[in-house]
Amino acid sequence: TTVLDKSFRLPNKIANFAKSIVKRIDRRYEKEWSSRDDEGLLEYHTKFDYINMSKGEWLVLARTHYLLQPIEAQCRREGWFYSKNNVPSVRKSLITSIQDWEKLRKGESISSAAVRKMYQFFKSDGNVTKKGRGLKNVTEYETFSLQNLQNDYGLRTSGIWHEAFDNLSIYEREYMIALLRRGEKLTEEPRVRLSTIHAAKGKECQHVVLLTDLSRKAWTQMQVHENDELRTFYV
């Protein structure tokens, strides 16, 4: 068996931080290994607000789910595109429907499947009539222009998406507007990922934020089984 003695992922400062955790574990077989050649960057912050995640890829790790809640709230306030436990902060169907709506406004046509998906974001008897919303007798092979939908399928608007989609909550609408103003790339994977430590095992990222807070339950367990908690943070 060959034991690799060099990490090509961890820069020196991060490796030293990891070793400072693992050396506190009792009765552990000592493994000799070295880091990458570069130093890397390790910073300590007393508040999450001090971390600027407006650019680049980020992985935020917490011991338990509830510790991610205030981080998620800040991501929404700032207009950062994120995922929490692998679930994106914006529904893919909404992103696609906004793109399809803008196609209609430019004079293009879209499929009946795209129309059905898009119509869920209009209130029945709001910006589309109740009768038109049903799209009766429409086949999967048909395509529709904005004028078709206005003339025959109850559409009552041609405004920009955040005015037209009247079935969106204010909460979701304002967040989407903030994302677009920031220039977030919504057709790509979210650049900020929020995860528990356990769920993120093996993942890598350009920037990693490790929340060192513990729940009362985890703190109590640590008083009895400290090694288990140390292994969690080390991994």
Located regions from the model:
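The feature marks helicase ATPase cores and/or their adjacent C-terminal helical subdomains
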Residues: 1-235
